[in-house]
């Protein structure tokens, strides 16, 4: 292992080895141990006591973070011509249908979220092999296939995010930026945890939340006590 830099030593000095932090404490410490010169992402990793190979234990959902994500979310609205004005007024960055289907076929996926009206899904379905692996395929369960495209766009712009468990039983998501106040980070983290608890499958027995870690881009992870979601 190479010699630690001054910043690395400072960061490690602020972390108590073996300690499990409350959400409130972790939200303060994460700002103290982040030394990047850019506005780093604040992330959460939650290991669940489920078997993601079983369909009735597949965790997926949406959550509207009270303080948003602190970054611009690029939204593509795939709609018919009569709906384009509503989508644009709601804040969609890209609006259309056939031209964007062709662009995506040719490899363009420079967006964060794609929202589609149900009436166009017959044409959008052919993009599944391209959009699916990137987590961009519109889906009714995540609210990205919607009759009210205008509302769906506004919700995404205001901080609504889609999450799902990976093959290892872990849910990973961004909950904000390091420029947020500790209170904003804590609020977003608790809202995400509360949503995870709501979508617990009825068939799951035993420990549901196995571990929770809070980190930022290039920072060490802080272990968080999941029970502190109801308090400090």
UniProtKB/Swiss-Prot annotation:
This is Large ribosomal subunit protein uL1. CDD domains: Ribosomal_L1 (cd00403). It comes from the Bacteria. One of its GO terms (biological process) is regulation of translation. PROSITE patterns: RIBOSOMAL_L1 (PS01199). Belongs to the universal ribosomal protein uL1 family. Part of the 50S ribosomal subunit. Binds directly to 23S rRNA. The L1 stalk is quite mobile in the ribosome, and is involved in E site tRNA release.
């Amino acid at each position: 292992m190479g010699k630690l830099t001054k910043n690395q030593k400072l960061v490690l000095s602020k972390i108590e080895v073996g300690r499990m932090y409350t959400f409130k404490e972790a939200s303060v410490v994460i700002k103290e141990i982040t030394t990047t010169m850019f506005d780093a992402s604040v992330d959460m990793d939650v290991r669940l006591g489920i078997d993601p190979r079983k369909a009735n234990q597949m965790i997926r959902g949406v959550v509207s973070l009270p303080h948003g994500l602190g970054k611009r979310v690029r939204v593509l609205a795939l709609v018919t011509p009569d709906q384009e004005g509503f989508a644009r007024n709601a804040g969609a960055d890209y609006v259309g249908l056939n031209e964007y289907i062709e662009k995506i076929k040719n490899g363009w996926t420079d967006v964060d979220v794609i929202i589609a009206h149900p009436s166009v899904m017959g044409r959008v379905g052919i993009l599944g092999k391209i959009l699916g692996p990137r987590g961009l395929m519109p889906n009714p369960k995540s609210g990205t296939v919607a009759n009210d495209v205008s509302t769906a766009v506004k919700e995404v712009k205001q901080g609504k995010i889609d999450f799902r468990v990976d093959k290892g039983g872990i849910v990973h998501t961004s909950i904000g930026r390091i420029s947020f106040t500790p209170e904003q980070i804590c609020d977003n983290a608790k809202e995400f945890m509360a949503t995870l608890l709501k979508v617990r499958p009825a068939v799951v027995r035993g420990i549901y939340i196995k571990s929770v870690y809070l980190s930022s881009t290039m920072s060490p992870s802080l272990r968080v006590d999941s029970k502190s979601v109801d308090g400090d």
